[in-house]
Design a protein with these regions (language model features):
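Membrane-interface interhelical linkers
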Residues: 1-10, 19-20, 25-30, 34-65, ...
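Specific alpha-helical transmembrane segments that line the substrate/conduction pathway
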Residues: 9, 65-73, 80-128, 178-186, ...
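Hydrophobic/small/kink-forming positions within alpha-helical transmembrane segments
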Residues: 11-14, 18, 45, 69-77, ...
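Interfacial loop-to-transmembrane junctions
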Residues: 249-271
Length: 280
């Protein structure tokens, strides 16, 4: 059951990421994130309420929540913008290496480091460099700058790594469900509300399905991940960390993104690195 939940979480997250990227191509990253936050909040808040009252809430917890929310939003901006500049099958796997950034922060903070973690981090860097080389071809689509897209994917990995590490500092105090709901409520206040006041939330009707899948899918994916951790955190991390692989497969086989050989090698190395980081 744990393996099934992990695969489902990775699949839902991967689909949500692709949907968000496609929505950003239609309406722009900012509006895509605003809608994703609003739709995600509709799901996240009831789930948080169903989980019971939140844990300790004080100034320290509030500051951590602000940091986590800022990192979540910055990561989404990077990913959605990256998917406008370049291919989904390159940006998503690079962004999925955020576990390596969290590991680096933990090392700096004084946590012990394993040889597997160092090796996986090195592999992730090599894979990201290879994935960024060359141009991706897609029938009917033109990418303005694949290298910029790869850099934005790496930027998402950095800020999401900080988010992952920061979440570990207060998850037991606040509760994972409330952490997810709080981040989305802040996202609505910071991004969606200002856009609404300026009349900037209007989107094309054809973008709505993508926005719905992106917003709801992200929350549902995290919920599946929480259930999966009951069967083992390491197993859950390995399986759900492959959301980038799912997104890449969608990009290659459904969106018909054509990668060069070096990029494919890079993606394979990233997949191996993500597994190694989850096991380290």
């Amino acid at each position: 059951m744990g393996i099934l939940l992990g695969i489902l979480a990775a699949t839902v997250w991967g689909i949500a990421g692709v949907a968000g990227g496609l929505a950003a191509r239609l309406v722009g990253p900012t509006r895509a994130i605003a809608w994703a936050m609003m739709l995600g909040m509709v799901v996240a808040v009831p789930l948080a309420l169903a989980s019971g009252a939140p844990g300790r809430i004080d100034v320290r917890t509030g500051l951590w929540i602000l940091l986590i929310s800022a990192c979540m939003l910055a990561g989404l901006v990077c990913v959605y913008a990256g998917m406008r500049y370049g291919s989904i099958s390159v940006v998503a796997p690079i962004s999925a290496t955020y576990g390596g950034v969290a590991a680096l922060i933990a090392i700096v903070a004084g946590d012990p480091v394993t040889g597997l973690a160092i090796g996986a981090l090195s592999l992730a860097v090599v894979g990201a460099v290879l994935a960024a080389r060359g141009e991706t071809a897609t029938p009917g689509a033109a990418y303005s700058n694949q290298r910029v897209a790869a850099v934005l994917g790496a930027g998402a990995a950095v800020v999401w790594g900080v988010q992952l590490w920061a979440g570990g500092q207060i998850q037991d105090d606040l509760g994972a469900s409330w952490l997810v709901a709080s981040a989305r409520m802040i996202g609505v206040l910071v991004i969606a509300l200002p856009l609404l006041l300026r009349g900037g939330l209007r989107v094309e009707r054809r973008a709505l399905p993508y926005l719905l899948v992106a917003g709801v899918g992200e929350v549902c994916g995290f919920t599946l991940y929480l259930f999966d951790t009951e069967y083992g955190i390491a197993q859950a991390a390995v399986l759900t960390g492959q959301y980038g692989t799912v997104a890449a497969l969608i990009g290659i086989f459904i969106l018909k993104e054509r990668l060069q050989f070096t990029q494919i090698i890079g993606l394979v190395l990233i997949v191996i690195a993500v597994i190694g980081l989850a096991l380290a």
